[in-house]
């Protein structure tokens, strides 16, 4: 591998047995190679070649990382491995096809934690993969004008910006102490309203612009329906601009998916008569933002159902959807804030289960099965937003998106905990059936020792356990209430509630609890087959909101 030229992406070239240099066939990359032990014979036999310069070592290679390939040929040979390297051709280089999203590569360097040495690159064993690949080899190909931005973090690391801690690990800028932590909490504060007779419009508008992330929902007619920050009057001008841009592409039989302006990414998702727009400055990909907008769409369907939404706009295309959605704005805002904070379940589209022993979970499952009634469709035991147990019909599994909507509604909406911790809620689960309503009975349990079983307003999300029973019969409230009472009684008798409480108190395990003495700070594993994930504790490395969000964003 040619380590001395790191100023721009390169491919390695092969040395033939006669000492000739063959460049790899590439139209957009530069090839530099110096053959080993090459001696050029001159026409005059009396002329002696100049002495060879001293062989560079690893540290000198690091210092000379900015040299060009032309200067390499002039300074003399470099010690390469004896085996000829393999040229990298155009098919070996990842490319970003037109129409696909532009990869945000600023997180690449931040995600790396490598040892501060190149000794692992100077192995005595000849390796074709090692000689033909580098950190830059895995980066999607971009135009020459974007090269500086794409590799800015890597070049900064080579120039000494990256610091080394006491463990010998490189501390990349993305995971250093966040200077934005102090004002990240302001992201969720209201921007205020423009008051009549008061000259505060500019101040409110500046607060709105200072937000790092915005979500907008508007109709095809250009009417604002919902926005995470501000109100319709404040953003009406911007909504008109966005609607004009979307309509311009639609008139050309094209669909606008995303575009970037500076460090701000705009993503647009069209769902029938509705436009969903995400505006982000916190380094998220198009795919991540698209999934978030689709989750907001499912939240709207959980309130209106798809037939009702279609009927409203078929009768009157300029329908104002604010009135039908009145009361669900809090749920939309709560879901949007979970994306901004970096909620793993929402960003990964997966569920997290409470960590308990298999035997204990088996007891809870059997208790839930024995307590079920005829009107029950789904039954769940949820602790702190993590699934403990679920019963369902054999051929009807719960969609992860539906469960996320339920958990967001149950644990984030304060109104659900009113009424002594007991609620009866009609809800549409779009993944199950987007055309009709189901009826959900929710009861919260407080497992604190100095309280009764029923949760009160002081019970936090992590301290409470929710019994969720779902039925297709809107008259089954009392039947499900009786099932809940029997279930709680049995869970107390077999000490399952105590097992759940202890698991909640323990929290997520630290990496050192799993592998003592490990240098691993944090891990997250997602099982695609089971649509579940597990993760270690955030503390102490990822205690801040911004660092947590960044780590989950990289994982997703």
Curated annotation (Swiss-Prot):
Q: Where in the cell is it found?
A: Endosome, Multivesicular body membrane; Prevacuolar compartment membrane; Vacuole membrane
What broad class describes the main subcellular location of this protein? membrane
Protein's membrane topology: Peripheral membrane protein
Q: Which Pfam families match?
A: Fuz_longin_1, Fuz_longin_2, Fuz_longin_3
Bias regions of kind Pro residues — which residues? 47-56
Which key words are in the record?
Autophagy, Endosome, Membrane, Protein transport, Transport, Vacuole
**Record InterPro entries:** FUZ/MON1/HPS1_longin_1, FUZ/MON1/HPS1_longin_2, FUZ/MON1/HPS1_longin_3, Mon1
Which family is annotated?
A: Belongs to the MON1/SAND family.
Role noted for this protein: In complex with CCZ1, is required for multiple vacuole delivery pathways including the cytoplasm to vacuole transport (Cvt), autophagy, pexophagy and endocytosis. The MON1-CCZ1 complex acts at the fusion of vesicles with the vacuole, through its regulation of the SNARE complex during the coordinated priming and docking stages of fusion, and particularly at the stage of tethering/docking.
The protein's matches in PANTHER family, at most eight in alphabetical order, are given as:
SAND PROTEIN-RELATED (PTHR13027), VACUOLAR FUSION PROTEIN MON1 HOMOLOG (PTHR13027:SF7)
What's the protein called, per UniProt? Answer: Vacuolar fusion protein mon1
Q: Source organism lineage?
A: Eukaryota, Fungi, Dikarya, Ascomycota, Pezizomycotina
């Amino acid at each position: 591998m040619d380590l001395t030229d790191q100023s721009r992406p390169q491919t390695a070239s092969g040395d033939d047995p006669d000492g000739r240099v063959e460049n790899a066939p590439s139209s957009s990359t530069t090839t530099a190679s110096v053959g080993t032990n090459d001696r050029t014979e001159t026409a005059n036999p009396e002329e002696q070649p100049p002495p060879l310069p001293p062989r560079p070592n690893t540290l000198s290679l690091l210092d000379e990382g900015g040299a060009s390939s032309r200067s390499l040929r002039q300074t003399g040979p470099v010690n390469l491995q004896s085996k000829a390297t393999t040229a990298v051709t155009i098919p070996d280089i990842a490319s970003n096809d037109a129409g696909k999203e532009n990869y945000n590569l600023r997180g690449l360097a931040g995600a790396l934690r490598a040892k501060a040495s190149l000794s692992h690159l100077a192995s005595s064993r000849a390796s074709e993969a090692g000689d033909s690949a580098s950190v830059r080899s895995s980066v999607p190909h971009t135009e020459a004008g974007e090269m500086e931005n794409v590799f800015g973090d890597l070049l900064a690391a080579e120039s000494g910006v990256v610091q080394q801690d006491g463990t010998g690990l490189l501390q990349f800028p993305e995971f250093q102490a966040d200077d934005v932590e102090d004002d990240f909490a302001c992201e969720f504060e209201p921007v205020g309203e423009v008051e009549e007779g008061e000259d505060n419009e500019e101040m409110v508008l500046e607060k709105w612009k200072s937000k790092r992330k915005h979500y907008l929902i508007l109709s095809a007619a250009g009417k604002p329906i919902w926005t995470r920050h501000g109100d319709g009057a404040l953003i009406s001008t911007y909504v008109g601009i966005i609607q004009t841009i979307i309509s311009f592409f639609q008139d050309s039989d094209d669909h606008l998916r995303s575009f970037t302006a500076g460090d701000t990414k705009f993503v647009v998702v069209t769902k029938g008569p509705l436009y969903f727009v995400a505006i982000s400055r916190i380094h998220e990909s198009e795919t991540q933002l698209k999934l978030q907008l689709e989750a907001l769409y499912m939240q709207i369907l959980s309130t209106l159902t798809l037939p009702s939404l279609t009927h409203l706009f078929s009768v009157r295309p300029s329908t104002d959807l604010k009135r039908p959605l009145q009361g669900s704005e809090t749920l939309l805002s709560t879901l949007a804030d979970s994306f901004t904070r970096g909620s793993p379940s929402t960003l990964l589209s997966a569920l997290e289960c409470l960590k308990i022993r298999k035997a204990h979970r088996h007891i809870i499952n059997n208790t839930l099965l024995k307590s079920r009634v005829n009107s029950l469709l789904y039954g769940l035991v949820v602790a702190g937003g993590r699934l403990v147990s679920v019963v369902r019909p054999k051929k009807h599994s719960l969609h992860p998106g539906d469960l996320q909507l339920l958990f967001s509604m149950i644990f984030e909406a304060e109104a659900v905990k009113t009424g002594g911790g007991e609620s009866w809620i009609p809800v549409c689960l779009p993944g199950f059936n987007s055309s009709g309503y189901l009826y959900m009975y929710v009861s919260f349990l407080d497992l604190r020792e100095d309280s009764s079983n029923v949760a009160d307003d002081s019970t936090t999300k992590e301290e409470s356990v929710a019994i969720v029973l779902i039925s297709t019969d809107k008259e089954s409230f009392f039947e499900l209430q009786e099932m809940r009472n029997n279930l709680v009684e049995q869970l107390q008798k077999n000490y399952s509630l105590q097992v759940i409480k202890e698991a909640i108190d323990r929290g997520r395990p630290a990496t050192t609890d799993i592998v003592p003495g490990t240098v691993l700070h944090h891990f997250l594993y997602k099982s695609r087959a089971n649509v579940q994930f597990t993760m270690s504790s955030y503390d102490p490395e990822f205690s801040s909101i911004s660092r947590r969000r960044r780590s989950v964003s990289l994982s997703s």
